[in-house]
Amino acid sequence: MTAAPPAGPATTPAAQSSVTAGLSTLDRYLAVWILAAMTFGLGLGRLVPGLDDALASVEVGGISLPIALGLLVMMYPVLAKVRYDRLDAVTGDRKLMISSLAVNWVLGPAVMFALAWIFLPDLPEYRTGLIIVGLARCIAMVVIWNDLACGDREAAAVLVALNSVFQVLAFGLLGWFYLDLLPGRLGLGDGERLDISMVEIALNVAVFLGVPLVAGFLTRRFGERRLGRAGYESRFLPRIGPWALYGLLFTIVVLFALQGGTITSRPLDVARIALPLLAYFALMWFGAFALGKAIGLTYDRTATLAFTAAGNNFELAIAVAIATFGVTSGQALSGVVGPLIEVPVLVGLVYVSLAWRRRFTAGRPGS
């Protein structure tokens, strides 16, 4: 969290009697601010005529500029904290790298496919939308959940970069497998096809990860040259740190303002979609956390593994659903409900993670 030392992830157990002891006001009441941002965004979308259309019209290449701006502001301070000269220590951790790839690209899509069919056997549009959400692995918002939970910043940077590469290469193939081939082979009915190109996915990755990653790297490089590492981390980083949460709150307001009318006008459908999403986030996060602990990862890398496993790229999922099935489709609604459930659930899991941090002992293997 912003109260933690900016010099890198903490790997020793928390000594405080309370998880929130010593945190700034902004961090301590994070759940309150996020709930307020969601409520405010939903209210704006519902009460201000034409606001959702106005926000939706400000886009380039299918990418919402207000959301892109919010994510850039959110991710830049976190990525400016990363010590890029330590990334080789992460890439050399084979247990972390292999576990992350397996959980994200083998287990994650399969779990969402199973849950979508279990919970929504009679609602094919919503089911397809959920499967698309499961295919879109997180490359953006996960960096702030990881930072708030005192995860390994360098590991998060490496894993989201790895996810972005696999997203470009594998999204279309996995979409064909889970939406077309597998349902037919299992006798579950006719499949669906996605209208999405590698170029569109690459553009999404470049905007939501590439821009803030390059900005963070250049800021640290030139900042350390001018101020030295100690000065950069003690003087500059504390000034930009709070902007990560400002960007997160702005993004949430814009996102829910865009979809406020849709969400509030179909509450029963939202509830049906929410159930498999809740099960998915719980299974992925707790399963990945247990895996990290079982294979001997330290707390910071276990937290990073868990949050990268549970998070999803809702921007890509919504864009694909709208481009393929239309803005008023059930598939698009499933994509919209994704962040409605993901944001508060992962905020809660940040506090769970911090509480469990004290169960880890210093000096465990895997770091």
Q: Language-model segments: what does each one mean?
A:
Residues 1-80, 85-309, 314-367:
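Alpha-helical transmembrane segments of multi-pass small-molecule/ion transporters
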